[in-house]
Amino acid sequence: DRIETEEERREVIWHEIKTSHIAGRILTGTLDGVEQTPSGRTIVVVDYKGYRIAIPLKEMMLYSGPVPYGAKYKPFMERMNSILATMLTAEIDFIVRGLDNTARSVVASRKAAMLRKRQTFYLDANEEGIPMIYEGRVVQARVIGVAEKVLRVEVFGVECTIFARDLSAAWFGDAREYYSVGDRVLVRVLTIDRGDINHISITADIRSVSSAANQSNLDKCVLQGKYAGRVTDVRHGVVFIRLNNGVNAVAHTCYDRRMPGKKDDVSFAVTRLDEERGIAVGIITRIIKQNL
């Protein structure tokens, strides 16, 4: 077997890029950066197997309708740039729209790829008249943005936001500890609004997919038992704790003279088991380790 040289490998990849341009084939790359052109336009830089692909902002499908002008333009661009900053390292699809053979520079559209996927997965139907993605279906999604209490995913050409309460039945303080941009996750599509191809919206959750969510862990706790756990949130004097054995717990009282804070490790004593809500209720006997 002959070993492929780096130059030959580059030629094969360039051929894939040219095929995307001629035949409209979808390619997938990694969002590497955001730049301003000398004329002040924003372009998104995508890496495709070592080649630099430029995608103009209007081809990123981050907004619908015309770009606002005048006083509204600056806040709009600030919002776009902050969205793009959270999307760094995300996996995105694109179709090549133009290329320069000598300079090997490429311009592409994410919008074209997303519309193609929407048509295939949401609008085209099989013999029974059912599209590939329907309500209740579990599908793989790409994580394209993560904040403390929210996840942004792309499901075959449609973006959607999943809030913390829909991520898991277990309580956690920060989604960034569990998810990162570029991950692939299984989601359940809950609702689909198939207005027209440019305005398809969905809601989805991860909570109903993870089977651990359905079984209550309460039998791992006994009354008057003491357990170690970590504080996930503190709201209105109520402390929310994820015990190390997997049980969700709530404390209204803390015997430690210090105030518990997020991510503190605490010792928790169970005073009541709330079967209906699937949580343990009790008191924090002491703070084992503060997260300062």
Question: Positions of the model-derived regions?
Answer:
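Single-stranded RNA-binding regions, centering on S1/OB-family and related RNA-binding modules
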Residues: 1-292
